[in-house]
């Protein structure tokens, strides 16, 4: 019987554990599986941790979640095909839930089986090499400070790529008298009440961190973009300007000549694909893009078909795309899907990369990733889900944000699994200061 190592028990790792569980429940024999998770619990990025910097064992804290974080996309677009929100909560819930609600949903799907028994918690993978047709993995039991090793036939890397921040350098940083932090360490917008906040970036983190700071009472929020502005109709107290030139004392000076008082600078400058636990020959090297190179179907490592990566793309689709990738990866491991020739693999990768390079706007990007996810869905037995409806929802969501960036979370969408329409939340997002699950689910 073959052995499979999975690194990471966040959403991607849980997806492939779930995929194997589906086969096992149908009476099929599955490989021996060991999942290594360096945190003390499962859920990955969705675990909130007050810590920043290092954990109690000296490892970097992987968590980037913060208080008052609400989903910035419709929950219907990430719904699991085999476990609906209606099933989990026993009723329809609003389309934009806070973090705790989504975490409860993610873990609810995997808590009922024996998936947890396959996970080694508080376990850090130190290094991995491929030798004699096996993956040799050295790992540390962090609680008992023991180093152990094991060998595996297949390796699935499901660590995500939103835990190692990219931190650029700007003139004047070393002498800036205020605070400089990456969004990875952002934990509570209340901390910046009455402050002049500079947010550097132009993607989802910058958008949400800036809105959070405004919502919870920042004196001003100035967003500095590098290439293209987000271009939303920002509420009072917020503005978007072109690219930070330098910090001069407590002033931020931008390329367009704007000068702004600054108490804190928050770097929403993205993350690195970082795999220090892999031998150099096994590492995926890419920036954040919709179709990383050298991955067949976005999953199988071109140079070694026993190495599989999950969730390494820039993302519109998330949980159900991870599931489609996981079902595909499972079937490759189980030899239910035969790998084509090297030439065919190369041709397929180049086709997707070439299409990605021609994308010009969010609608095209949504179409691209929807078609990619549908292709994976069609070649596995992942349960039925309406990806055309999800495509439509994503485009409506983008339109709602353009209409009003402050109120788009107050909209409702229909489930691609059950068809039920989400109710309107009892409190508009811009006025909802309590993000607890209890308050969200129960009308006051």
Swiss-Prot record:
UniProt-reported outcome of changing residue 170 to A: Retains 5% of wild-type activity with DMS as substrate
Transmembrane segments: none
pH dependence: Optimum pH is 7.0 with DMS as substrate.
Binding positions (FAD): 12, 37, 39, 45-46, 72, 125, 315, 318
Effect of residue 409 to A: Retains 60% of wild-type activity with DMS as substrate
Top-level enzyme category: oxidoreductase
Listed InterPro entries: FAD/NAD-bd_sf (IPR036188), Flavin_mOase (IPR000960), Flavin_mOase-like (IPR020946), FMO-like (IPR050346)
Positions that bind NADP(+): 70, 72, 170, 202-203, 205, 226-227, 288, 409
Stated consequence of mutating residue 227 to A: Retains 60% of wild-type activity with DMS as substrate
Complex formation: Homodimer.
Gene that produces this protein: tmm
Cofactor: FAD
Tagged with keyword Flavoprotein: yes
Entry function: Catalyzes the oxidation of trimethylamine (TMA) to produce trimethylamine N-oxide (TMAO). In vitro, has a broad substrate specificity, oxidizing many nitrogen- and sulfur-containing compounds, including dimethylamine (DMA), dimethylsulfide (DMS), dimethylsulfoxide (DMSO) and methimazole. TMA shows the highest affinity.
GO molecular function: flavin adenine dinucleotide binding; N,N-dimethylaniline monooxygenase activity; NADP binding
Entry keywords, A to Z: FAD, Flavoprotein, Monooxygenase, NADP, Oxidoreductase
Temperature dependence: Optimum temperature is 25 degrees Celsius with DMS as substrate.
Annotated Pfam families: FMO-like
Effect seen on changing residue 46 to A: Retains 10% of wild-type activity with DMS as substrate
Species of the source: Pelagibacter sp. (strain HTCC7211)
Enzyme Commission numbers on file: 1.14.13.148
Name under which the protein is recorded: Trimethylamine monooxygenase
Superkingdom of source: Bacteria
Other remarks on this protein: The catalytic process consists of a reductive half-reaction and an oxidative half-reaction, via the formation of a C4a-hydroperoxyflavin intermediate. NADP(+) undergoes a conformational change in the oxidative half-reaction.
Family under the similarity heading: Belongs to the FMO family.
């Amino acid at each position: 019987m073959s052995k499979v190592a999975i690194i990471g028990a966040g959403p991607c790792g849980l997806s492939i554990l779930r995929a194997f569980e589906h086969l096992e429940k149908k009476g099929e024999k599955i490989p021996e599986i060991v999942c290594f998770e360096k945190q003390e619990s499962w859920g990955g990025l969705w675990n909130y941790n007050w810590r920043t910097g290092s954990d109690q064992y000296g490892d970097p804290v992987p968590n980037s979640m913060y208080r008052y974080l609400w989903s910035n996309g419709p929950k219907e677009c990430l719904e699991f095909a085999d476990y609906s929100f209606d099933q989990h909560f026993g009723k329809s819930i609003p389309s934009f839930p806070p973090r705790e609600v989504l975490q409860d949903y993610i873990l609810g799907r995997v808590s009922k089986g024996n998936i947890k028994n396959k996970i080694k918690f508080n376990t850090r993978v130190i290094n991995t090499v491929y030798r004699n047709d096996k993956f040799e993995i050295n790992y540390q039991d962090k609680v008992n400070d023991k180093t152990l090793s094991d060998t595996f036939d297949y390796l699935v890397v499901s660590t995500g790529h939103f835990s190692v921040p990219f931190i650029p350098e700007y003139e004047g940083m070393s002498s800036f008298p205020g605070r400089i932090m990456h969004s990875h360490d952002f934990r509570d917008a209340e901390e910046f009440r009455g402050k002049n906040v500079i947010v550097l970036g132009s993607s989802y983190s910058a958008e949400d961190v800036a809105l959070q700071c405004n919502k919870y009472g920042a004196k001003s929020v100035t967003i500095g973009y590098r290439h293209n502005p987000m271009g939303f109709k920002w509420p009072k107290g917020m503005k978007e300007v072109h690219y930070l030139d330098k910090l001069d004392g407590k002033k931020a000076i931008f390329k367009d000549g704007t000068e702004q008082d600054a108490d804190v600078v928050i770097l929403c400058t993205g993350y690195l694909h970082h795999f220090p636990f892999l031998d150099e020959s096994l590492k995926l090297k890419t920036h954040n893009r919709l179709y990383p190179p050298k991955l067949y179907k976005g999953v199988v490592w071109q140079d070694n078909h026993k190495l599989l990566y999950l969730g390494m793309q820039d993302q519109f689709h998330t949980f159900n795309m991870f599931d489609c990738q996981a079902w595909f990866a499972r079937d490759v491991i189980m030899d239910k899907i035969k790998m084509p020739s090297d030439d065919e693999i190369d041709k397929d990768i180049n086709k997707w990369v070439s299409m990605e390079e021609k994308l010009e706007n969010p609608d095209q990007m949504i179409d691209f990733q929807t078609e990619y996810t549908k292709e994976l869905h069609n070649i596995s037995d992942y349960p039925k889900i309406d990806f055309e409806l999800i495509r439509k929802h994503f485009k409506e969501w983008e339109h709602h944000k353009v209409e009003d960036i402050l109120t788009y979370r107050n909209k409702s969408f229909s489930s691609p699994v059950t068809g039920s329409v989400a109710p309107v939340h009892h409190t508009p997002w811009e006025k909802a200061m309590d993000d607890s699950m209890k308050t969200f689910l129960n009308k006051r």
